[in-house]
Amino acid sequence: MPPKKVKEVGPPPGLDASLNSELSAAGCMNYVKLAEDFCDMDVICVPTGFPQLDYILHDKLRGCPRGRDVEIYSKEPELGKTTISLAFLKAFQKARLRTCYDDVERTMTLQYLKDLGMQIRPEENMEQYAIRLMRHEDSVIPAEVWLDTLIKLCGIMDLVVVDSVAALEKKANLEKKPGEPNQVGGLSLLLSEFYRKNVAKKATILWINQMRTKIGQYSPNGSVPLDTTGGKAIKFYSSIRLELSYVDKIRETKDGDPIGMKIKVFTSKNKVAPQFRQAIMSYIFGTGFSQHFDYMDAGLKNEIITKKGSWLSFGNWKAQGPLNFHNLMREDAELFKEIRIMVDGEDSVVAENVSQGTKPEDFEE
Protein backbone atom coordinates (compact mmCIF):
# COMPACT_ATOMS: atom_id res chain seq x y z
CA MET A 1 0.00 0.00 0.00
CA PRO A 2 1.59 3.30 -1.06
CA PRO A 3 2.33 5.76 1.75
CA LYS A 4 -0.04 8.62 2.19
CA LYS A 5 1.13 11.99 0.99
CA VAL A 6 1.57 14.50 3.76
CA LYS A 7 -0.29 17.66 2.97
CA GLU A 8 1.97 20.68 3.15
CA VAL A 9 0.55 23.32 5.43
CA GLY A 10 1.66 26.84 4.60
CA PRO A 11 1.24 29.97 6.65
CA PRO A 12 -2.30 31.21 7.02
CA PRO A 13 -3.29 33.90 4.54
CA GLY A 14 -2.68 37.43 5.74
CA LEU A 15 -0.14 36.36 8.40
CA ASP A 16 2.26 39.23 7.66
CA ALA A 17 -0.53 41.80 7.71
CA SER A 18 -1.88 40.41 10.99
CA LEU A 19 1.53 40.48 12.66
CA ASN A 20 2.24 44.01 11.48
CA SER A 21 -1.18 45.13 12.68
CA GLU A 22 -0.68 43.64 16.15
CA LEU A 23 2.83 45.05 16.48
CA SER A 24 1.70 48.49 15.34
CA ALA A 25 -1.12 48.47 17.87
CA ALA A 26 1.41 47.65 20.59
CA GLY A 27 3.62 50.55 19.49
CA CYS A 28 6.36 48.31 18.05
CA MET A 29 8.13 48.44 14.72
CA ASN A 30 7.16 46.12 11.90
CA TYR A 31 8.98 42.81 11.83
CA VAL A 32 11.26 41.76 8.99
CA LYS A 33 11.62 38.25 7.59
CA LEU A 34 15.14 36.86 7.77
CA ALA A 35 14.69 35.55 4.24
CA GLU A 36 14.51 39.13 2.99
CA ASP A 37 17.48 41.39 2.40
CA PHE A 38 17.94 42.57 5.96
CA CYS A 39 21.06 44.69 5.45
CA ASP A 40 21.16 45.92 9.07
CA MET A 41 22.34 42.46 10.14
CA ASP A 42 25.43 42.63 7.93
CA VAL A 43 28.71 43.51 9.63
CA ILE A 44 30.60 46.37 7.95
CA CYS A 45 34.18 46.93 9.10
CA VAL A 46 36.55 49.88 8.90
CA PRO A 47 40.23 48.82 8.55
CA THR A 48 42.49 50.38 11.17
CA GLY A 49 45.64 50.09 9.04
CA PHE A 50 47.18 47.60 11.50
CA PRO A 51 46.89 44.11 9.94
CA GLN A 52 47.32 42.17 13.18
CA LEU A 53 44.75 44.29 15.01
CA ASP A 54 42.33 44.06 12.08
CA TYR A 55 42.65 40.27 12.10
CA ILE A 56 41.74 39.80 15.78
CA LEU A 57 38.85 42.28 15.43
CA HIS A 58 37.36 40.41 12.46
CA ASP A 59 39.32 37.63 10.78
CA LYS A 60 37.35 37.86 7.51
CA LEU A 61 36.37 41.50 7.04
CA ARG A 62 39.53 42.81 8.74
CA GLY A 63 38.69 45.88 10.78
CA CYS A 64 36.54 47.49 13.45
CA PRO A 65 32.82 46.70 13.03
CA ARG A 66 30.55 49.70 12.66
CA GLY A 67 27.59 50.27 14.95
CA ARG A 68 29.03 48.11 17.75
CA ASP A 69 30.47 48.83 21.19
CA VAL A 70 34.17 48.23 21.83
CA GLU A 71 35.71 48.34 25.31
CA ILE A 72 39.46 48.85 25.83
CA TYR A 73 40.91 48.23 29.29
CA SER A 74 44.13 47.19 31.02
CA LYS A 75 45.30 46.17 34.46
CA GLU A 76 48.19 48.65 34.40
CA PRO A 77 48.32 52.35 33.48
CA GLU A 78 50.20 53.88 30.54
CA LEU A 79 49.78 50.98 28.13
CA GLY A 80 48.37 52.98 25.23
CA LYS A 81 44.59 52.74 25.74
CA THR A 82 44.05 56.33 24.63
CA THR A 83 46.64 56.02 21.86
CA ILE A 84 45.06 52.92 20.32
CA SER A 85 41.65 54.60 20.49
CA LEU A 86 43.11 57.50 18.49
CA ALA A 87 44.22 54.94 15.89
CA PHE A 88 40.54 53.97 15.55
CA LEU A 89 39.64 57.66 15.25
CA LYS A 90 42.24 58.18 12.54
CA ALA A 91 40.95 55.18 10.58
CA PHE A 92 37.32 56.36 10.74
CA GLN A 93 38.35 59.89 9.77
CA LYS A 94 40.27 58.63 6.72
CA ALA A 95 37.25 56.52 5.77
CA ARG A 96 35.26 59.80 5.52
CA LEU A 97 33.19 59.09 8.64
CA ARG A 98 32.14 61.50 11.40
CA THR A 99 34.08 61.10 14.64
CA CYS A 100 33.94 62.54 18.15
CA TYR A 101 36.41 62.27 21.05
CA ASP A 102 34.86 62.81 24.48
CA ASP A 103 37.68 63.90 26.78
CA VAL A 104 36.03 63.21 30.12
CA GLU A 105 39.42 63.13 31.88
CA ARG A 106 40.44 66.48 30.28
CA THR A 107 43.98 65.29 29.52
CA MET A 108 44.17 65.42 25.71
CA THR A 109 46.45 67.99 24.09
CA LEU A 110 46.48 69.33 20.55
CA GLN A 111 50.21 68.67 20.20
CA TYR A 112 49.77 64.97 20.99
CA LEU A 113 47.10 64.67 18.29
CA LYS A 114 49.50 66.28 15.80
CA ASP A 115 52.33 63.95 16.84
CA LEU A 116 50.12 60.94 16.12
CA GLY A 117 49.40 62.23 12.62
CA MET A 118 45.78 63.17 13.22
CA GLN A 119 44.24 65.52 10.67
CA ILE A 120 43.43 68.58 12.77
CA ARG A 121 42.50 70.96 9.95
CA PRO A 122 40.24 69.18 7.45
CA GLU A 123 40.60 69.56 3.72
CA GLU A 124 38.30 71.78 1.70
CA ASN A 125 34.67 70.60 1.76
CA MET A 126 35.62 68.02 4.42
CA GLU A 127 34.68 70.00 7.56
CA GLN A 128 32.05 67.44 8.54
CA TYR A 129 34.76 64.78 8.88
CA ALA A 130 36.92 66.80 11.28
CA ILE A 131 37.31 65.25 14.73
CA ARG A 132 35.01 66.83 17.29
CA LEU A 133 36.55 67.19 20.75
CA MET A 134 34.13 67.35 23.67
CA ARG A 135 35.43 68.83 26.91
CA HIS A 136 33.92 70.72 29.84
CA GLU A 137 36.60 73.03 31.23
CA ASP A 138 34.90 74.49 34.31
CA SER A 139 33.74 71.42 36.24
CA VAL A 140 32.94 67.75 35.90
CA ILE A 141 29.73 67.04 33.99
CA PRO A 142 27.28 64.84 35.92
CA ALA A 143 26.97 61.41 34.36
CA GLU A 144 23.22 61.87 33.92
CA VAL A 145 23.71 64.92 31.67
CA TRP A 146 26.64 63.35 29.84
CA LEU A 147 24.76 60.13 28.98
CA ASP A 148 21.82 62.10 27.57
CA THR A 149 24.28 64.00 25.36
CA LEU A 150 25.91 60.73 24.29
CA ILE A 151 22.55 59.34 23.14
CA LYS A 152 22.14 62.35 20.83
CA LEU A 153 25.71 61.99 19.55
CA CYS A 154 25.11 58.35 18.65
CA GLY A 155 22.47 59.46 16.16
CA ILE A 156 24.84 61.94 14.47
CA MET A 157 28.35 60.51 14.67
CA ASP A 158 29.84 57.32 13.25
CA LEU A 159 32.39 56.85 16.05
CA VAL A 160 32.35 58.19 19.62
CA VAL A 161 35.36 57.61 21.90
CA VAL A 162 34.70 57.92 25.65
CA ASP A 163 37.87 58.58 27.69
CA SER A 164 37.16 57.27 30.23
CA VAL A 165 34.38 55.46 32.08
CA ALA A 166 36.25 55.78 35.39
CA ALA A 167 36.05 59.60 35.16
CA LEU A 168 32.24 59.61 35.06
CA GLU A 169 30.45 60.49 38.28
CA LYS A 170 26.83 60.84 39.33
CA LYS A 171 25.39 64.22 40.26
CA ALA A 172 24.60 63.06 43.80
CA ASN A 173 28.25 62.17 44.44
CA LEU A 174 29.47 65.45 42.95
CA GLU A 175 27.19 67.54 45.18
CA LYS A 176 27.70 65.61 48.42
CA LYS A 177 29.49 67.22 51.35
CA PRO A 178 32.90 66.01 52.55
CA GLY A 179 32.52 62.98 54.78
CA GLU A 180 29.20 61.84 53.34
CA PRO A 181 29.20 58.32 51.84
CA ASN A 182 29.12 57.81 48.08
CA GLN A 183 26.22 56.15 46.34
CA VAL A 184 27.37 52.60 45.58
CA GLY A 185 26.54 51.21 42.14
CA GLY A 186 25.04 54.45 40.85
CA LEU A 187 27.12 54.62 37.67
CA SER A 188 26.40 50.99 36.75
CA LEU A 189 22.65 51.66 37.02
CA LEU A 190 23.02 54.74 34.81
CA LEU A 191 24.94 52.83 32.16
CA SER A 192 22.30 50.09 32.13
CA GLU A 193 19.64 52.77 31.66
CA PHE A 194 21.73 54.34 28.87
CA TYR A 195 21.78 51.10 26.88
CA ARG A 196 18.04 50.63 27.26
CA LYS A 197 17.44 54.14 25.91
CA ASN A 198 20.06 53.96 23.16
CA VAL A 199 18.54 51.09 21.18
CA ALA A 200 18.38 53.03 17.89
CA LYS A 201 22.03 54.10 17.83
CA LYS A 202 24.12 53.54 14.71
CA ALA A 203 27.45 54.84 15.98
CA THR A 204 30.39 52.78 17.14
CA ILE A 205 31.10 53.58 20.80
CA LEU A 206 34.64 52.99 21.99
CA TRP A 207 34.79 52.87 25.79
CA ILE A 208 38.16 53.36 27.50
CA ASN A 209 38.03 51.78 30.93
CA GLN A 210 40.24 51.18 33.93
CA MET A 211 40.45 48.33 36.42
CA ARG A 212 39.91 48.51 40.17
CA THR A 213 40.20 46.02 43.01
CA LYS A 214 36.97 44.45 44.23
CA ILE A 215 36.36 45.60 47.80
CA GLY A 216 35.87 42.81 50.31
CA GLN A 217 36.65 39.97 47.91
CA TYR A 218 39.74 37.77 47.96
CA SER A 219 40.88 34.81 45.89
CA PRO A 220 42.20 31.58 47.48
CA ASN A 221 45.83 32.53 46.76
CA GLY A 222 45.46 35.80 48.68
CA SER A 223 45.37 38.23 45.75
CA VAL A 224 42.57 40.75 45.32
CA PRO A 225 40.48 40.23 42.14
CA LEU A 226 40.21 43.10 39.67
CA ASP A 227 37.26 44.37 37.65
CA THR A 228 36.49 47.26 35.29
CA THR A 229 34.62 50.33 36.52
CA GLY A 230 31.00 51.09 35.66
CA GLY A 231 29.49 47.75 36.63
CA LYS A 232 28.73 44.98 34.18
CA ALA A 233 26.58 46.85 31.63
CA ILE A 234 29.43 47.68 29.23
CA LYS A 235 30.84 44.19 29.72
CA PHE A 236 27.62 42.56 28.50
CA TYR A 237 26.57 45.09 25.84
CA SER A 238 30.00 45.39 24.17
CA SER A 239 30.55 43.33 21.05
CA ILE A 240 34.35 43.44 21.48
CA ARG A 241 36.51 43.78 24.60
CA LEU A 242 40.23 44.43 24.14
CA GLU A 243 42.60 43.85 27.06
CA LEU A 244 46.02 45.52 26.84
CA SER A 245 48.99 44.13 28.76
CA TYR A 246 52.71 44.84 28.90
CA VAL A 247 55.13 42.44 27.15
CA ASP A 248 58.59 44.03 26.81
CA LYS A 249 60.53 47.24 26.22
CA ILE A 250 61.84 48.36 22.83
CA ARG A 251 65.44 49.62 22.89
CA GLU A 252 67.75 50.84 20.14
CA THR A 253 70.71 49.21 21.90
CA LYS A 254 70.94 46.56 24.59
CA ASP A 255 71.77 49.07 27.35
CA GLY A 256 70.02 52.07 25.80
CA ASP A 257 66.96 53.89 27.04
CA PRO A 258 63.58 52.43 26.06
CA ILE A 259 61.99 54.06 23.03
CA GLY A 260 58.75 52.09 23.23
CA MET A 261 56.97 48.98 24.44
CA LYS A 262 55.60 45.75 23.09
CA ILE A 263 51.90 45.60 23.99
CA LYS A 264 49.72 42.51 23.81
CA VAL A 265 46.16 43.19 22.60
CA PHE A 266 43.87 40.32 23.62
CA THR A 267 40.22 39.90 22.59
CA SER A 268 38.61 38.75 25.84
CA LYS A 269 35.22 39.01 24.09
CA ASN A 270 34.24 39.10 20.43
CA LYS A 271 30.69 38.59 19.16
CA VAL A 272 31.46 39.17 15.48
CA ALA A 273 34.51 36.89 15.10
CA PRO A 274 36.38 34.16 17.00
CA GLN A 275 37.54 35.45 20.38
CA PHE A 276 40.58 34.79 22.59
CA ARG A 277 43.01 35.95 19.92
CA GLN A 278 45.97 38.22 20.51
CA ALA A 279 48.27 40.56 18.63
CA ILE A 280 51.63 41.91 19.78
CA MET A 281 51.82 45.57 18.78
CA SER A 282 54.69 48.05 19.03
CA TYR A 283 54.01 51.29 20.91
CA ILE A 284 56.64 53.98 20.21
CA PHE A 285 56.76 56.83 22.73
CA GLY A 286 55.63 60.12 21.24
CA THR A 287 54.39 58.74 17.92
CA GLY A 288 51.93 56.02 18.98
CA PHE A 289 51.53 52.49 17.66
CA SER A 290 53.82 51.80 14.71
CA GLN A 291 52.13 50.68 11.51
CA HIS A 292 55.52 49.74 10.05
CA PHE A 293 56.28 47.42 12.98
CA ASP A 294 52.86 45.81 12.62
CA TYR A 295 53.32 45.07 8.92
CA MET A 296 56.83 43.79 9.59
CA ASP A 297 55.57 41.37 12.27
CA ALA A 298 52.73 40.25 10.00
CA GLY A 299 55.23 39.73 7.18
CA LEU A 300 57.42 37.58 9.42
CA LYS A 301 54.45 35.46 10.51
CA ASN A 302 53.34 34.91 6.92
CA GLU A 303 56.95 34.24 5.82
CA ILE A 304 56.82 37.21 3.46
CA ILE A 305 59.89 38.63 5.20
CA THR A 306 62.75 36.16 5.58
CA LYS A 307 64.70 35.94 8.83
CA LYS A 308 68.11 34.24 8.99
CA GLY A 309 69.78 34.67 12.33
CA SER A 310 69.52 38.35 13.20
CA TRP A 311 69.14 39.45 9.56
CA LEU A 312 65.77 40.28 7.99
CA SER A 313 65.39 40.46 4.23
CA PHE A 314 62.71 41.14 1.64
CA GLY A 315 63.76 41.02 -2.00
CA ASN A 316 66.88 43.14 -2.37
CA TRP A 317 66.35 44.89 0.97
CA LYS A 318 68.21 43.61 4.01
CA ALA A 319 68.84 44.87 7.56
CA GLN A 320 70.19 43.45 10.80
CA GLY A 321 67.66 43.31 13.59
CA PRO A 322 63.93 44.12 13.64
CA LEU A 323 64.49 47.75 14.66
CA ASN A 324 66.86 48.43 11.76
CA PHE A 325 64.48 46.77 9.30
CA HIS A 326 61.65 48.87 10.77
CA ASN A 327 63.71 52.02 10.22
CA LEU A 328 64.41 50.88 6.66
CA MET A 329 60.67 50.50 6.04
CA ARG A 330 60.06 54.02 7.36
CA GLU A 331 62.74 55.54 5.13
CA ASP A 332 61.92 53.56 1.98
CA ALA A 333 58.29 54.09 0.95
CA GLU A 334 58.60 51.59 -1.91
CA LEU A 335 59.66 48.81 0.48
CA PHE A 336 56.76 49.51 2.84
CA LYS A 337 54.31 49.63 -0.06
CA GLU A 338 55.40 46.25 -1.42
CA ILE A 339 55.26 44.57 2.00
CA ARG A 340 51.85 46.10 2.65
CA ILE A 341 50.50 44.76 -0.65
CA MET A 342 51.91 41.31 0.09
CA VAL A 343 50.48 41.22 3.63
CA ASP A 344 47.05 42.51 2.64
CA GLY A 345 46.97 40.40 -0.52
CA GLU A 346 45.35 41.30 -3.80
CA ASP A 347 42.27 39.24 -2.95
CA SER A 348 42.10 40.26 0.72
CA VAL A 349 38.89 41.54 2.22
CA VAL A 350 40.65 44.82 2.98
CA ALA A 351 40.21 45.70 -0.69
CA GLU A 352 36.45 45.14 -0.36
CA ASN A 353 36.33 47.60 2.55
CA VAL A 354 38.15 50.15 0.41
CA SER A 355 35.28 50.13 -2.07
CA GLN A 356 32.87 51.16 0.69
CA GLY A 357 34.18 54.71 0.87
CA THR A 358 37.90 54.66 1.64
CA LYS A 359 40.90 54.88 -0.66
CA PRO A 360 44.03 52.70 -0.79
CA GLU A 361 46.28 55.57 0.26
CA ASP A 362 44.18 56.01 3.40
CA PHE A 363 45.88 53.00 4.92
CA GLU A 364 49.33 54.51 4.81
CA GLU A 365 50.74 55.88 8.03
Task: Identify the function of each model-found stretch.
Residues 2-128:
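The Walker A/P-loop phosphate-binding site
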Residues 53, 72, 113, 163, ...:
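Residue-level signature of catalytic and energy-coupling elements of molecular machines
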Residues 61-65, 91-95, 118-124, 151-155, ...:
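Conserved catalytic network of the ASCE P-loop NTPase/AAA+ motor domain
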Residues 75, 87, 92-184, 189-193, ...:
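Conserved inter-motif catalytic segment of the P-loop NTP-binding fold
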Residues 173, 213-217, 308-311, 322-324:
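N-terminal cationic and glycine-rich segments that engage phosphates or anionic surfaces
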Residues 182-302:
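Phosphate-binding/switch region of NTP-binding enzymes
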Residues 291-320:
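Long, well-ordered amphipathic alpha-helical subdomains in the mid-to-C-terminal portions
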Residues 310-365:
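Terminal-proximal interaction/regulatory segments of ATP-powered molecular machines
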